Amino acid sequence: MRVLVIEDNEDFRKLALTWFQSYGIEVEGAANGAQGLALQRARPADVIVTDIFMPEMEGIETIHDLRKEFPEAKIIAMSGRDPLANLDVFEVARQVGAAKTFSKPFKFEDLIAAVRELSGAKEQRAP
């Protein structure tokens, strides 16, 4: 299984890459939506995890463009904004193609479970 993480916060992106790798999941990271689209075109991921609020190309636009080019893409949207404020933006994210949404902070194990569910992969515990 291969995962693409699109996240502008470098610390969070590096942490996510480390977590996915610890579960034996091949992962690549992008700092914004434009980079994410380029990586998806070059080496399509099974699941894409994207932040919603990013500079250059916001997550909603990224999800829309990913869905347009990759209609079968499995996409998870996440946001660190206030959970109540996220309700509306998560609804829009689902309307444009996100299968699941997460409010930061979240348990990384829950994200792993969602990625595995969407990809159809069997569970593997971190060492």
Regions found by a protein language model. Name each.
Residues 29-38, 59:
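Helix N-cap/capping motif at the beta->alpha junctions
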Residues 51:
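Active-site residues of response regulator receiver
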Residues 61, 82-102, 109:
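Alpha4 helix (beta4-alpha4-beta5 surface) of REC/receiver domains from two-component response regulators
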Residues 103-117:
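C-terminal output helix
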